[in-house]
């Protein structure tokens, strides 16, 4: 699986992210590193993955609901296919947990 052209830089980024989360500075760091459009793209990918893992809607419906392109949905779907199933189970649990928390906060 392709991760990065420069693994040393990628690992430095991951280390910085870990430190930011440990110290409660993840919001500031991601705001510094990502443009508003990039942050929106990451948030959209989370929504796409969540919808795809839920399996209650067709990809075309997800595309329409999230107002995005078929190619964007396909990229999310393709990544799900190449990730280890155990990891995807974990992601699904996290997304389901987050959705339950959001529903309970109304």
Swiss-Prot record:
Subcellular location: Cytoplasm
Main location: cytoplasm
InterPro entries named in the record: Trp_repress, Trp_repress_bac, Trp_repressor/repl_initiator, TrpR-like_sf
DNA-binding region: 59-82
GO BP terms in the entry: negative regulation of DNA-templated transcription
Key words of the record: Cytoplasm, DNA-binding, Repressor, Transcription, Transcription regulation
SUPFAM superfamilies according to UniProt: TrpR-like
GO MF terms, alphabetically ordered: DNA-binding transcription factor activity; sequence-specific DNA binding
NCBIfam families: TrpR
Function: This protein is an aporepressor. When complexed with L-tryptophan it binds the operator region of the trp operon and prevents the initiation of transcription.
HAMAP family the UniProt entry points to: Trp_repressor
Subunit-structure text: Homodimer.
Family to which the UniProt record says this protein belongs: Belongs to the TrpR family.
Protein name per Swiss-Prot or TrEMBL: Trp operon repressor homolog
Organism: Histophilus somni (strain 129Pt)
């Amino acid at each position: 699986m392709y991760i990065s052209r420069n693994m040393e830089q990628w690992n430095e980024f991951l280390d910085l992210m870990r430190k930011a989360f440990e110290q409660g500075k993840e919001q500031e760091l991601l705001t510094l590193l990502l443009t508003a459009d990039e942050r929106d793209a990451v948030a959209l990918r989370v929504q796409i993955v969540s919808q795809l893992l839920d399996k209650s809607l067709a990809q075309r419906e997800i595309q329409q609901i999230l107002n995005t392109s078929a190619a964007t949905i396909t990229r999310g779907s393709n990544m799900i296919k190449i990730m280890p199933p155990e990891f995807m189970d974990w992601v699904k649990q996290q997304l389901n947990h987050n959705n339950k928390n959001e529903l309970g906060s109304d």
